[in-house]
Amino acid sequence: MGASEKRKDYISWDEYFMGIAMLSGMRSKDPNTQVGACIVSPDNKILSMGYNGFPKGCSDDEFPWERENDKDSNLTKYPFVTHSELNAILNYRGGSLEGTKLYVSLFPCNECAKAIIQAGIHTVVYDSDKYRGTPSNRAARRSAFHTAGQDVRYISGSERQIKGV
């Protein structure tokens, strides 16, 4: 490669934004599942980011991180954790999210799918689909994304090792 030619091995926009989503997920204190999300404008500007965690003002040390509790299901993380997609939507302080793209490291649950559609986000790009086939996952695919006409696609965020990460 001569000095007058541009580099050819740079990462794509999809790789870049999925990398940002995955990096955001590393902020999660959840010991089992770390999910990150990044909302991007049609002209490839980052608008917002989020990761799964407890709401503002709720101490990470006082609320449970357990996935199961045989005595009381309210003593698990599930009633309290806000998912990365919803955090990214709520963290946005601009105008409309109409026509934007959401990069998320894990395929959205049905509740997040509804919020994504209502926010006007048009494209969802995800990396992992480890809950494929679960009731929430099937509902998100069928009733939410498919019916609403969302563009949903898979990319692997780990196709290329990001140096220094």
Name these PLM-found stretches.
Residues 1-165:
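Zinc-dependent deaminase catalytic domain
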